[in-house]
Regions:
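Active-site-proximal, glycine-rich beta->alpha crossover segments in alpha/beta enzymes
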Residues: 57-157
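N-terminal basic, low-complexity leaders that serve as flexible interaction/assembly modules and, when applicable
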Residues: 1-60
């Protein structure tokens, strides 16, 4: 959609996700243009990674890149368990989108599962074979379980 491309030309993915007005605007664009059954909030499953202490970037042509990936127990221990307040931008985008939708269609939200978040955090981005994830899982089970627990608490908090 042209209006989406215009916003993307001015703002990064993270900027669109972290700015409630922009995220709500992107959420509403398809609803305002097409007769759809529901709206999906514009966000990304990796948003919790930054406030937890990981450096996240959406590199052009590469997708998400974590510049300080989790590789061992010490890295897991450094990750903060954040509360909902750390992602107020998403909650505010949801409020704004719901207000603008005014009941026309339902608003769908989503979150990344602990394994998915861990895989990105460990691999440093997307992966085809998840070798580093498997390595941590099998060679450092204590670190793996602690990481799963942290991500589970973050996405349910």
């Amino acid at each position: 959609m042209a209006e989406n491309r215009a916003l993307r030309a001015k703002h990064s993915i993270l900027e669109l996700c972290k700015t409630p007005e922009l995220a709500a605007q992107v959420t509403l664009q398809p609803i305002d243009r097409f007769p759809l059954d529901a709206a999906i909030i514009f966000a990304d499953i990796l948003l919790p990674l930054e406030p937890m202490g990981l450096s996240l970037e959406f590199a052009e042509g590469e997708g998400p890149v974590i510049h300080n990936p989790v590789r061992d127990q010490a890295d897991v221990e450094r990750l903060k368990v954040i509360d909902g307040g750390e992602l107020d931008c998403v909650a505010e985008a949801i409020r704004q989108a719901r207000r603008a939708l005014n009941g026309r269609v339902p608003l769908i939200g989503f979150a990344g599962a602990p394994f998915t978040l861990a895989s990105y955090a460990i691999e440093g981005g997307s992966s085809r074979n998840y070798l580093l994830t498997k390595q941590l899982m099998y060679c450092e089970p204590k670190a793996w379980h602690q990481l799963m627990d942290k991500f589970a608490r973050v996405i349910t908090g």
